Swiss-Prot record:
BP term (GO), one: cold acclimation
Residue ranges, compositional bias (Basic and acidic residues): 173-193
Cross-referenced Pfam families: Dehydrin
Organism from which the protein derives: Arabidopsis thaliana
Stretches the record annotates as Disordered: 78-100, 153-193
Protein name: Dehydrin Xero 2
Tissue: Expressed in desiccated pollen grains or seeds, roots, stems, trichomes and the vascular tissues of leaves, and in all tissues of young seedlings.
Organism superkingdom: Eukaryota
GO cellular component, one term: cytosol
Amino acid sequence: MNSHQNQTGVQKKGITEKIMEKLPGHHGPTNTGVVHHEKKGMTEKVMEQLPGHHGATGTGGVHHEKKGMTEKVMEQLPGHHGSHQTGTNTTYGTTNTGGVHHEKKSVTEKVMEKLPGHHGSHQTGTNTAYGTNTNVVHHEKKGIAEKIKEQLPGHHGTHKTGTTTSYGNTGVVHHENKSTMDKIKEKLPGGHH
């Protein structure tokens, strides 16, 4: 490739080789029986985190590596199991039976619910990939504004409906308050969804 030798006869890498090593899927040089001390820059540390990049492979040698700030931070992140992680964290066929899901809403979600025409989140059976959730009960916490609205004259209380949905899940119960718009839509001809 673009290898050059300096005055002492030590091979130096050309810019093309340096760039090629940084590209995902490049398998770097192979060293045998070599003691290798390496201090990595920010780019190398980031590139090592990408899937498909395997860096230098040493057989029979000792490889000492000084970890930088990026690697230390990456190891502290949840789900990161060090720099030699193998396999994936994907679960298939997971079955969650009899679980209770309590949802605490963010400020944005609370504000969005107060806006006219917004009917809240209708999410059921989350956090399971390619599996089945059975008997999941979904509770929503009432906010201060909802409690005040119940105390106002003319408010007829909450009408909680227990609906069993079958979107690939069995026995999922989602309790929700009907909005005024939903009640009006039900009264209109053809408004039964």
